[in-house]
Regions:
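Conserved GNAT acetyl-CoA-binding A-motif
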Residues: 113-126
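Conserved N-terminal entry element of GNAT/NAT acetyltransferase domains
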Residues: 1-14, 18, 27-29, 141, ...
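Acetyl-CoA-dependent GNAT
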Residues: 36-87, 93-95
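Conserved active-site alpha-helix within GNAT-family acetyltransferase domains
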Residues: 103, 126-144
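Conserved acetyl-CoA pyrophosphate-binding loop and the N-cap/start of the following alpha-helix
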Residues: 96, 100-108
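C-terminal "cap" of GNAT-fold acetyltransferases
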Residues: 127-128, 145-156
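Hydrophobic alpha-helical core bundles mediating ligand binding, dimerization, or RNAP-core interactions
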Residues: 16-24, 43-47
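A short gly/proline-enriched turn/hairpin at secondary-structure junctions
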Residues: 26-37
């Protein structure tokens, strides 16, 4: 499988809308409300903030499987001003889970963050989310945990 990072255009935000609205895909997000409504009128401001004016504090890309010609997920990170850390985000469309895309996406995200000068990448994952194991297999370690989340980190 050949997976490539794609910097989406504004008119391609419908894939992100589809990801966030899909119940199976967003089931991991149950602790924070599940699916996320993301109507088209919000796209431009979000796009300007994340893609155009990222100020090297935000990174966002689609994962494209070139073999099948489909987007399979998204990867991102952003600098959290409250905790003073870079937080990762990866979402794989439910029908593509269990096929290795998350491993590839996580490695591409870490490589991109490192190239952009990020030294440590974190992710706060719901305590009952099975993806914790995947992050640990990909070099993340537990930083701390609460009753709600496990904070994982990887030194890049």
């Amino acid at each position: 499988m050949k997976v490539k990072l794609i910097k989406p255009k504004l008119d391609e935000m419908s894939f992100r809308q589809k990801l966030l609205a899909d119940e199976d895909t967003m089931s991991y997000n149950h602790a924070w409300g599940g699916t996320i409504e993301w109507p088209q009128y919000k796209w431009k401001d979000w796009y300007d903030y994340w893609i155009i004016n990222h100020r090297n504090q935000r990174f966002y890309r689609y994962l494209l499987d070139e073999d099948i010609g489909e987007y399979v997920g998204e990867i991102a990170y952003h600098y959290d001003n409250v905790h003073k850390i870079n937080l990762a985000n990866i979402i794989i469309l439910a029908r593509f889970r269990g096929k290795g895309y998350c491993n590839i996406g996580l490695n591409l995200l870490c490589d991109s963050a490192k190239q952009n000068g990020v030294a440590i990448l974190y992710d706060d994952i719901a305590i009952d989310n099975p993806s914790i194991t995947l992050f640990l297999r990909n070099g993340f370690t537990e930083d701390y945990r609460t009753t709600e989340i496990i904070m994982l980190k990887k030194i890049l």
